[in-house]
Amino acid sequence: MAASKNNFFDHVRWLRQAALDAGFELIIAGESMQALLRRGEYFWVLQPQFLASVNGVAQYTSTLIDEVTHFAGWLPDRSKRWPAANDKLIFKQWAHHAGLRVPAYSISTDSDMTDVVVKRAASSFGAQIQGPFRTCAQCLIDSSRRDYYEQFVDGEIFKVWYWNGAPMAAERDTMPRVTGNGRSSFRRLIEDRANLMQKCEPSELSHLLERAAVVLAYFGRSLDDVPEPGERQIVEFRYGSTLMSPRGRLVLDMRTNVNPRWDELREAGRLLYTAIPEDLRPGTLFTADAIYDGQHFWWLEMNSHPAVHPLAYPAIVASLGATAASRASSASAVRRPVPQTQPNFLN
């Protein structure tokens, strides 16, 4: 069974095995949820990350607060930031000049682009994404908030994890669709899909239906239409939507997958790594989002301090071990006296 970033025990299993393979002792703190990796007189503390919903807004936090909904993995450093990961417009400009494919976009309030979505340069977790729309006039942008139009690309959704520019894992998701049965309206089909894994809160369901209504309108349909038996219809396109089903996700182990089909992902990682300031590059995990249209990848954004995929732990831990070995005789080595007891850590 493929490892899942949404399964806490997959995180523990993969980190534990990576530690064993590298000759580390692993201790996880019950209070802080930090992970201590220790080998001889060298040790590292991996910082936990959690996904929380605070006042309806999704955000990462390093503390296990009451609003936490998911565990998001352990990172060597949560402080790294760089412009191309903080701002989607900066990313687009950089990626285009680097030779990566990016969807056409415009920051003009009177753009004549067609088939667009509206995004905000500094948003995350799919927030502030609207559309798709046939024309820009259907949704005017606010330049003061750094909104922009982006060409809507229909295809498979990819999120790729890179460690030091090398791909570790990728998730491939299909854009959520419903299938007609000749009796149920799109509204009912969407409600059924939203409640497939667990019952959806009324407020969230209402929000999902509002979004789906816009998507359906783009395709000339409405929530009250009844699709024909077997008719398939896209009802969402945002990554992370409740309408995305884990059953439709394919996890690719990019450490061992040599399929030429994914060469574009490998080359993109090499280029994206150079978008990170040189002094921040060593020991960096980042993700990149793309749409695969059946022939090529169209790159949307990159992210620092992302939710960790368990498949990345072997490379992360191996790098820490290599760092200790290479710095063993250096004054800058990560070398500290290890206390005889660790009162805050539990085996």
Where are these regions (language model features)?
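A short, surface-exposed helix-loop junction/capping segment
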Residues: 1-3, 70-79, 231-256
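Active-site ExK catalytic segment of metal-dependent nucleases
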Residues: 88-91, 119-121, 130-131, 150, ...
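ATP-grasp fold ATP-binding core
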Residues: 85, 95, 104-106, 113-130, ...
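Phosphate-binding site of ATP-dependent enzymes
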Residues: 133-242
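Short solvent-exposed loop/turn micro-motifs enriched in small/polar/acidic residues
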Residues: 29, 152-155, 281-285
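C-terminal active-site "lid" helix and adjoining low-complexity regulatory extension at the edge
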Residues: 6, 243-287, 291-347
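A short beta-strand motif that forms the metal-chelation/ATP-contact edge
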Residues: 34-46, 115-120, 159-162, 167-169, ...
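Conserved N-proximal alpha/beta basic substrate-recognition cap immediately N-terminal to
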Residues: 4-113
